[in-house]
């Protein structure tokens, strides 16, 4: 609400981990006083301009939406929930977006550290810190652009990591490369 007051016209796009939870997430935001709609319900007759929160209820559309974002808050990382451990912060980094994530990024520790060290991400731990960081990035465009570039540099440096790992493992396991 604090960020909304200082930055009217903001649009929040929420992507539940499981799209079948979209209706429940939509009800939570509506109960909190936000004008909310499911992504599948958007149309020319129901423009996003009159909406504050769009809840994604379809698989496979999140990545391209990062291109439209000003800032990305990577979920699954604010609370310690068994089996989650954060979502992939390289997805918004690919689009040069400044990134926020919580302290529970156990599935992406190395990338988390690289993004924080490079200045491409901010770690937030509660609603107050999310609002402060988001407000700063929305107010200071040059900071958001710089963070986005730094996040993209981390993405670029880590492209092909799976292929590099496979090539290294193959070389180690290939008997033709064994030395007496």
Label the model's feature ranges.
Residues 1-180:
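Nucleotide-activated sugar donor-binding and catalytic core shared by glycosyltransferases
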């Amino acid at each position: 609400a604090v960020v909304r007051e200082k930055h009217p016209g903001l649009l929040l796009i929420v992507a539940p981990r499981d799209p079948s939870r979209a209706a429940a997430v939509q009800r939570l935001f509506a109960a909190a006083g936000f004008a909310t709609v499911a992504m599948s319900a958007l149309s020319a007759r129901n423009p996003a301009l009159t909406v504050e929160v769009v809840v994604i209820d379809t698989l496979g559309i999140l990545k391209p939406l990062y291109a439209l974002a000003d800032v990305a808050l990577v979920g699954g990382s604010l609370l310690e929930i068994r089996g989650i451990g954060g979502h992939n912060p390289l997805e918004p980094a690919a689009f040069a977006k400044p990134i926020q994530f919580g302290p529970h990024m156990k599935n992406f520790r190395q990338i988390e550290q690289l993004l924080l060290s490079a200045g491409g991400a901010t770690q937030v731990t509660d609603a107050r810190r999310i609002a402060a960081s988001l407000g700063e990035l929305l107010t200071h465009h040059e900071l958001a652009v710089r963070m986005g570039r730094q996040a993209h540099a981390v993405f670029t440096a880590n492209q092909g990591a799976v292929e590099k790992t496979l090539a290294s493992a193959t070389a180690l396991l290939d008997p033709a490369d064994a030395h007496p």
